[in-house]
């Protein structure tokens, strides 16, 4: 028992009253597209394993092989003595695929955004306080990185490039380096940024474009390498993850050689973290071999999204501006979203309810994450369950 347990308990009770308390549930591995949860196998529509690679035999084989050959851990941070040839091999392969001069591995997407942004703003401080323009719906890790650096965010309306350009023009004569920080695919809404237009806007206003590609990597863009590929040379830094479309773990930044060398020297999340272990590197390496060849899987995934969005629209369920494998069923009330998720689970489907503070108040939803591992029969099951479940929730309200 700790000295602050009474405070912790009170906070949990308040969260429960607001219907936003979370609890961990026991999950076990199953074939792609499914999940054993609390001892029951469900069709999984909540996973970020968009291409079904997390259970791909090549990833498992190479992870095992590299661990056997090179050990279970890297033993230290890369600047001390943990910089293996494997790290540089994977970074070189990734840079070739991304079409950038260099790439740098990091431990997670959250760590990348939380640590890379402060490092960038520190370098820019020589020109005065940086101007940091951020999308209002950016991921929490991007906001955290800005807050950790102590910079003021100039927020533009979601995906509204006219508003962004207006804000930039308003401050045209102000000192300080300019940064535009946004996502290519937004994790809770499934919509995408117009990356070529963003890149052109950034060029006009001499702004550094930071693009979070966590939910695009593997799934969208040329060879599945993200939407930055639609604007060659126009994105200054692309951040992405290996834990979603690539089925493994970890994150990266890709950009110029000078940028990556600077981050080796200035990014706390790189400097003070033990390097990724050989098994993880092996899985990443295998995924990078597979992903460029998975055009059919990507086409299947986009087809699933189009079909589901049409079904939700026919049922009167708002799915926002989704155009990707992430399809929100926006319910509004947190209690109704929880009830719909429970109805789906009763019918053998997992689609987790997302509530505040993850999404704004009044926009609670089921975040439906599709996978190329889902078949048409499973999509049929989801569509039927959503229709029946939504009727049941409305009748009970």
From Swiss-Prot:
Binding residues for substrate: 22, 139, 358
PROSITE patterns noted in UniProt: AA_TRANSFER_CLASS_2
Residue sites binding pyridoxal 5'-phosphate per the record: 109-110, 187, 212-215, 241-244
GO molecular function: 8-amino-7-oxononanoate synthase activity; pyridoxal phosphate binding
Pathway noted in the entry: Cofactor biosynthesis; biotin biosynthesis
Protein's GO biological process: biotin biosynthetic process
Task performed by this protein: Catalyzes the decarboxylative condensation of pimeloyl-[acyl-carrier protein] and L-alanine to produce 8-amino-7-oxononanoate (AON), [acyl-carrier protein], and carbon dioxide.
Family statement drawn from the similarity comment of this UniProt entry: Belongs to the class-II pyridoxal-phosphate-dependent aminotransferase family. BioF subfamily.
Name the record gives this protein: Putative 8-amino-7-oxononanoate synthase
The species this protein was found in: Bordetella pertussis (strain Tohama I / ATCC BAA-589 / NCTC 13251)
